Amino acid sequence: MSAFSLSDLERIVAKRAAASPDESWTAKLVAAGQERAAKKLGEEAVEAVIAAIAQDRDGLKNEAADLLYHLLVVLKIADIPLSDVFAELERRTGQTGLAEKAARPTP
């Protein structure tokens, strides 16, 4: 098994985002802006859901990879480092799911 991590992918996304949009899909997506990147993230999420419902293991694996990649692109555009997401996950693990949800502000 590879030691590849989400942090590795975050570094790859950052490097590719700095490239020319003519040479990099990531740079092209970043140049298109957050709305386009977020729509692409949503498309990938729907495709992952469809694969999960269909019990398509290979499809779900592939769509999950696409989903993680596009999430990191959206985070890059928003200037939110993965370490901030990890910190939030760590904070939440100190509570039960019900307690964490109850502590959230209501919209």
Swiss-Prot record:
It is found in: Cytoplasm. Gene3D superfamilies: MazG-like. Its main location: cytoplasm. It comes from the Bacteria. Keywords: Amino-acid biosynthesis, ATP-binding, Cytoplasm, Histidine biosynthesis, Hydrolase, Nucleotide-binding. InterPro entries: HisE, PRib-ATP_PPHydrolase-like. It is an enzyme of class 3 (hydrolase). One of its GO terms (biological process) is L-histidine biosynthetic process. It catalyses: 1-(5-phospho-beta-D-ribosyl)-ATP + H2O = 1-(5-phospho-beta-D-ribosyl)-5'-AMP + diphosphate + H(+). It holds the Pfam family PRA-PH. One of its GO terms (molecular function) is ATP binding. GO terms for cellular component: cytoplasm. Its EC number is 3.6.1.31. Pathway: Amino-acid biosynthesis; L-histidine biosynthesis; L-histidine from 5-phospho-alpha-D-ribose 1-diphosphate: step 2/9. Belongs to the PRA-PH family. This is Phosphoribosyl-ATP pyrophosphatase. The lineage of its organism: Bacteria, Pseudomonadati, Pseudomonadota, Alphaproteobacteria, Hyphomicrobiales.
